[in-house]
Amino acid sequence: MSISRREFLKANAAVAAATAVGATLPVKIVEAAEQKDNIKWDKAPCRFCGVGCSVLVGTDNGKVVATKGDPESPVNKGLNCIKGYFLSKIMYGKDRLTTPLLRMKDGQYDKEGEFTPISWDSAFDIMADKWKDTLKTKGPTAVGMFGSGQWTVWEGYAASKLHKAGFLTNNIDPNARHCMASAVGGFMRTFGIDEPMGCYDDLEAADQFVLWGANMAEMHPILWARLSDRRLSSPTSRVHVLSTYENRSFDLADNAMVFRPQSDLVILNYVANYIIQNDAVNKDFVNKHTKFALGTTDIGYGLRPDHPLEKKAKNPGNGKSKPISFDEYAKFVSSYTLEYAAEMSGVEPEKLELMAKAYADPNVKMMSLWTMGINQHTRGVWANNMLYNIHLLTGKIATPGNSPFSLTGQPSACGTAREVGTFAHRLPADMVVANPKHREITEKLWQVPAGTIPPKPGFHAVLQSRMLKDGKLNCYWTMCTNNMQAGPNINDEMYPGFRNPENFIVVSDPYPTVTAMAADLILPTAMWVEKEGAYGNAERRTHMWHQQVKAPEGAKSDLWQLMEFSKRFKVSEVWPAELIAKQPELADKTLFDVLYANGVVDKFPSSECKGQYNDEADAFGFYVQKGLFEEYAQFGRGHAHDLADFDTYHETRGLRWPVVDGKETLRRFSKGDPYVKGDKEFDFYGKPDGKAVIFALPFEPAAEEPNEEYDIWLSTGRVLEHWHTGSMTARVPELYRAYPDAQIFMHPEDAKARGLKRGDEVIVASPRGEVKTRVETKGRNKPPRGVAFMPFFDARQLVNKLILDATDPLSKETDFKKCPVKVMKA
């Protein structure tokens, strides 16, 4: 392979730009330097964020030795961010777990005992005993699982089947509850169907971009590289950035806005009002394709019912609405004037107006992008609805460059948590357990008796913690997530439930995380390309990979664990007699037989596996992944969630659903979408009348605000070098050295007022706990006076101890962005 001087110079220029977002060299340059014939390369989606980059995985002598950006990927086009570059090292931490560990004392299980190695059979024996006893004495609502947006598609599907059709409980919820539940709520309320209508191609087609509380430069760096390329190559392109503190995304901002926490609701309504007042409503679009509704207000904060804020709320948890007219909506938002928005938000009026004008201009294609700043919000569903309001009022939606785009945090929060339906209230393809017709469809496809799936939603993530603490949830299995570090209000609501002597806690993880160390039984887990998998990214792209190396001896995939565990239960041991009477032939079968060896999941022979390895197929005697996928895909085909056949995904870099007649769909709800029929330009077919809903929703304050004692807002989040709790990235030496310790970022004047300076050790405290850290007054994050920021990747500084477990009452998603604290010298 040769490179010309011109190509070399061009590549260097590209690298200079890419370095700003932690991107790596284009693959062509990398290959020129490497050329190691003994390395075998295969594709896989990246293990980290929801962008869904494709990487080439290099294996040699049974180990992953290198990764690089995939030049054939339409997502990342050969680029990697810094985390993707070091993917090859995430599986080889020195403390990788390889044997089950049970708390024992004097040779027996003991809640206060020391972790002791045991066999897999022994681990499943004690698990089965605990589950059977709990199911018998307390019933299905006393067992549950906390899963992950990092599960593969079939892991999430197998887990959902095991609980909803096996253990007869809806007590399964993913960690996506903490990050994407408000996005789901926004989609379902406005459009009646989940996930973005646009795609990443809109980054190259949009004229202007608005980032609503999204630090894309660090959290979605490859998409930021594409956005940056558009901004720098188009003279008329502009970038507006809103956040509660300055971050690296502000480096590219033409219009930088730092707003007071919670006031984004005011700004959103101001923009809608501006559009109406300046006669910029796309009347033809609005009349044909939208309707208006007034949302219920004063809905509380998702706290325990006896909390004063819940007692005070008039309509706690009420998501109902009533129809209104356009004129009534216009009157509702008319009080959200420029002056009011500027006063409430602290943003300069001219900056707010500049952004509003861009939305209102019919000749400017607009792309809105948001993630945790909007979703992790006590009114996150409302904020999502209000963002869609702006795009619907102007008709700037579902066409190239006009895109309200909800970004995703995890690699399969879309593909697994949302599409598969691993939430406590959901079923596959946007169906819900509360709907009798949806339960009937699911039960028929799963070949289980009518009435198997409970109609009542199970415990959501925050409620699971409360129920564990209260002794109402007693057998609990956590997989592929580290909630004891990532979840809210750890001291008061989470840790007590794990250590409640009534409860038996199981954690499946490759490493001894904070969550694992609080458990009773730890199960060692296979990672990433140590198993065959599929993820679904933020643009509806489903992408598969083959197993490329063996897991360390003793570590088993989540899928194997779920299916093998199901063999320990006979139907007669877990189902009531009246349910068995409907299909008595199932009585002596195991849950494995009923759920996974049902003639559909097990119909594909192991010989169809095309990867070098497939440990699950070897263990169970059939192509497990293909069988689970093809059964699951039946839910969406013909129902606007169409997936291609299994084998096609292994031959591509992913396809965006709906996939009909072998063709993916770039944009939904507009011409080109196979579900938009005839000569229609738009059809919001998730709603029975084909019309999207524009909601009238007000500003409501945060659950807590700073006071005399706790006088500064704290926001938590991520950094470029680490992902979530650092359970993988902190074990990569290069990433750990790049960012070893969390700090609290403060305004220099706030630090000075407290007698602090950069580098000082401090105590950060809220009414719920305290952490010790160091002050940072410079660097990448620059909060305004009265605001501080602290990342949550550092297991030695559990900052989420400080966070109140207040949630959006509609989505049940926690607000991690607004916590009053005090900062004191240590």
Swiss-Prot record:
Q: Which residues bind substrate?
A: 792
Q: What class of enzyme is it?
A: oxidoreductase
Q: Which UniProt keywords apply?
A: 4Fe-4S, Electron transport, Iron, Iron-sulfur, Metal-binding, Molybdenum, Nitrate assimilation, Oxidoreductase, Periplasm, Signal, Transport
* Record-listed Mo-bis(molybdopterin guanine dinucleotide) binding positions: 83, 150, 175, 179, 212-219, 262-264, 372, 376, 482, 508-509, 531, 558, 716-725, 800, 817
Reaction(s) this enzyme catalyzes, per UniProt: 2 Fe(II)-[cytochrome] + nitrate + 2 H(+) = 2 Fe(III)-[cytochrome] + nitrite + H2O
- Cofactor dependence: [4Fe-4S] cluster; Mo-bis(molybdopterin guanine dinucleotide)
Q: What is its EC number?
A: 1.9.6.1
Signal peptide span: 1-32
Describe how the cofactor binds.
Binds 1 [4Fe-4S] cluster. Binds 1 molybdenum-bis(molybdopterin guanine dinucleotide) (Mo-bis-MGD) cofactor per subunit.
Query: Which GO biological process annotations does it have?
Result: cellular respiration; Mo-molybdopterin cofactor biosynthetic process; nitrate assimilation
Q: Which residue pairs form cystines in this protein?
A: none
| Cellular component GO terms held in the UniProt record | membrane; nitrate reductase complex; periplasmic space
Q: Domain of life here? A: Bacteria
Similarity section: Belongs to the prokaryotic molybdopterin-containing oxidoreductase family. NasA/NapA/NarB subfamily.
Q: What is this protein called?
A: Periplasmic nitrate reductase
**Annotated organism of origin:** Shewanella halifaxensis (strain HAW-EB4)
